[in-house]
Amino acid sequence: MTRDPVATARTLSEALPYLQRYAGAVVVVKFGGNAMGDEAAMAEFARDIVLMRQVGVNPVVVHGGGPMINELLGKLGIKSEFVRGKRVTDKATVEVVEMVLSGLVNKRIVQAINDQGGRAVGISGKDDDLMVCVADDPELGFVGKPVEMNVQVLRDLYNAGIIPVVAPVATGMADNETFNVNGDTAAGAIAGALQADRLLLLTDVAGVKDASGQVLSQLTPSQVREMVATGTISGGMIPKTETALAALDAGVRAVVILDGRIPNACLIEIFTDEGAGTIIRSTEPRIKPRIR
């Protein structure tokens, strides 16, 4: 495919205000969904993350791994159970979860980023007590809710030019048991603790939709709560919007729910006027170049 050099130059020029705006910003990216099982999509995601780092953004990647967990549990003959969309995690299951998330999935993402010329280091919520949890719900077993965060290790990594890749498993507060943490929940807690400029939740849908099925480009927290109350937001989108509202309450500037299957979704959201998906925020955007 022949590229128009003039159009390429124009695109780069139009990105300048955003490059200035996001220089030094912390952007937490939750990577999950079908893109995780596609090598080409994984490579494209990694390339976007490396580019963000190269132009001065500090990306922190948090990942899920549900399909891979289900696959290994099936091979081991361990039945998967879910309550209100969350995995029931008994002792046998949590060992598999940790093996898949901290081992297989985490290292695949790290390798993909390194293959694109980045410097990535994989850790879990256990490392340096990044996340300490209590049980989220007795019905769910070893599913954790983060109650203490130590994100200095993440700052140390990105200040050294390294991209942290975090597996959402954590240590229990009371007895040092291992807990599985929902990937969106972990990403929101990390973003809040870092006071991140953006939290990007990559999914397999285009964003939050209204009652007619149209994707909404932006919402306020009060609008989100109203849509949940009326049932317009339902199913799997409810926990994602709950994560978004909790992150905003914790000090994150804005949360974006976007389709991770779209090529260059993260770059479109961060560096273009159009953005991608649905942005949820309480304040007006700051998208203009700095005035000297």
Swiss-Prot record:
Catalytically driven reaction(s): N-acetyl-L-glutamate + ATP = N-acetyl-L-glutamyl 5-phosphate + ADP
Chief localization: cytoplasm
Biological or metabolic pathway of the protein: Amino-acid biosynthesis; L-arginine biosynthesis; N(2)-acetyl-L-ornithine from L-glutamate: step 2/4
Site (described: Transition state stabilizer): 30, 240
Transmembrane segments: none
Domain of life: Bacteria
PANTHER family: N-ACETYLGLUTAMATE SYNTHASE, N-ACETYLGLUTAMATE SYNTHASE, MITOCHONDRIAL
Recorded family membership: Belongs to the acetylglutamate kinase family. ArgB subfamily.
Protein name as catalogued: Acetylglutamate kinase
Native source organism of the sequence: Cereibacter sphaeroides (strain ATCC 17025 / ATH 2.4.3)
Gene: argB
